């Protein structure tokens, strides 16, 4: 891509960039600059759980670098090598053109097993801080997500709101690859309660105006059924489960009136943080202007509980209770907790199915089984919160 390729080790000639591979064993997830603050900063930038574990690994990297042990601890390397006729690094030249400085190192996050897999590149300052992020789509499915995020950020930049969102530095085709480059936003991780985020999610719903409609008659539900039709036509995975789940939702809540407004689409700790008292929100590629109000809160509960559960199957009742608690923190009624939970889980199953249908390596070991458990279980009242 872009006139060069990745090769193992450090070749004798033609190397444009050299990276250390993190983690040092197992599947590569991050290509980090080879040394110093940039190496440490690249891990901190992409750790996505800026909690205890992320801090511990960052401390370990810092110690290895300062003690001169990085070559021994991080012994896997890969290099970017230019194709014949290519001079310099086209990717570096692109980043230099938007940053107006050559003083940075490149870090690359490798994503697989996810429904939005793409290369994410960071330009890291000599002090180890990110200057910007570049998303490079690897195919038509992801290219549309990248284009959609570019449009969403432009729309949000044109209206008044209280969130801090990335500024677009470049958006469009670059050497045949749909690309989005945005500013990197400094943010500290959300506290455990994350009340600021929960309240902001309800404010976000109103940004594009709100409308009320029966679920089955809404544009949102038409789009969901259209996605199912596309999967059916391409013999996509989990079609039977998605069909039965859509019937399940329509039978129980299709005639119920919902409010619809702007949703982020991936409202989770990995994409949210704080800058002072303001909420920072990144990664808007799944945002839509007509989703059920507070669907983001159900997604937040789903991702939070999923990380806590590890490889264990999530408990449907506990997940619904968590959604109800987040609704209460946002000042909203918990009446829709069950419906929103079902819609959040269905959305994730559809995303993974769409990715697999598009030829991506997307492994859903969690949401499909959860959706089956949810649709086979009687619909009762949401259990009361335990505090």
Roles of regions detected by a PLM:
Residues 2-3, 7-8, 15-110:
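Juxta-kinase regulatory segment immediately upstream of eukaryotic protein kinase catalytic domains
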Residues 167-177:
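Short beta-strand micro-motifs within the conserved protein kinase catalytic domain, predominantly
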Residues 176-187:
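Conserved short submotifs of the Hanks-type protein kinase catalytic core
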Residues 295-331, 345-358:
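Active-site activation/catalytic loop segments of kinase-like enzymes and analogous catalytic loops
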Residues 118-123, 251-295:
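Active-site acidic catalytic loop and adjacent metal/ATP-binding pocket
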Residues 312-321, 351-387:
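ATP/Mg2+ or Mg2+-diphosphate-binding catalytic cores
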Residues 149-165, 185-231, 242-257, 265-268:
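Conserved kinase catalytic-core helix
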Residues 117-147:
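ATP-binding glycine-rich loop module of kinase domains
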């Amino acid at each position: 891509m872009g006139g060069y390729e990745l090769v193992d080790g450090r070749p004798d000639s033609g190397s444009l960039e050299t990276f250390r591979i993190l983690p040092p064993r197992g599947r590569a997830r991050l290509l980090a600059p080879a040394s110093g603050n940039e190496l440490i900063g690249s891990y901190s930038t992409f750790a996505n759980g800026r909690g205890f574990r992320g801090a511990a690994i960052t401390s370990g990297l810092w110690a290895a670098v300062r003690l001169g042990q990085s070559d021994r601890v991080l012994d896997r390397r890969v290099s970017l090598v230019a194709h014949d006729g290519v001079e310099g690094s086209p990717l570096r030249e692109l980043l230099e053109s938007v940053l107006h400085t050559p003083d940075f190192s490149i870090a690359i996050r490798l994503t697989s097993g996810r429904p939005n897999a793409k290369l994410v590149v960071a330009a890291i300052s000599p002090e180890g801080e990110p200057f910007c992020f570049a998303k490079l789509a690897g195919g038509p499915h992801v290219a549309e997500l990248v284009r959609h995020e570019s449009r969403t950020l432009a729309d949000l930049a044109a209206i008044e709101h209280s969130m801090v969102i990335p500024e677009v530095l470049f958006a469009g085709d670059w050497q045949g690859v749909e690309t989005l480059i945005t500013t990197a936003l400094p943010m500290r991780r959300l506290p455990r309660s994350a009340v600021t985020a929960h309240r902001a999610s309800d404010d976000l719903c109103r940004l594009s105006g709100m409308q009320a409609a029966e679920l089955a008659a809404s544009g949102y539900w038409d789009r969901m059924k259209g996605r199912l039709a596309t999967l059916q036509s391409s013999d996509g995975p989990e079609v039977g489960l998605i069909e039965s789940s859509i019937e399940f939702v329509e039978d129980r809540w299709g005639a119920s009136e919902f409010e619809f407004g702007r949703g982020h689409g991936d409202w989770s700790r990995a994409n949210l943080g704080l800058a002072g008292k303001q909420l920072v929100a990144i990664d808007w590629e799944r945002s839509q202007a007509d989703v059920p109000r507070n669907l983001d809160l159900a997604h937040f509960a789903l991702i939070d509980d999923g990380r806590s559960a590890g490889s264990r199957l999530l408990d449907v009742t506990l997940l619904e209770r968590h959604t109800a608690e987040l609704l209460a923190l946002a000042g909203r009624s918990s009446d829709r907790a069950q419906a929103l939970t079902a819609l959040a889980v269905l959305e994730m199953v559809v995303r993974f199915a769409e990715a697999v249908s598009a030829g991506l390596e997307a492994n859903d070991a969690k949401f499909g089984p959860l959706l089956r458990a949810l649709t086979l279980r009687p619909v009762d009242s949401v259990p009361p919160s335990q505090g």
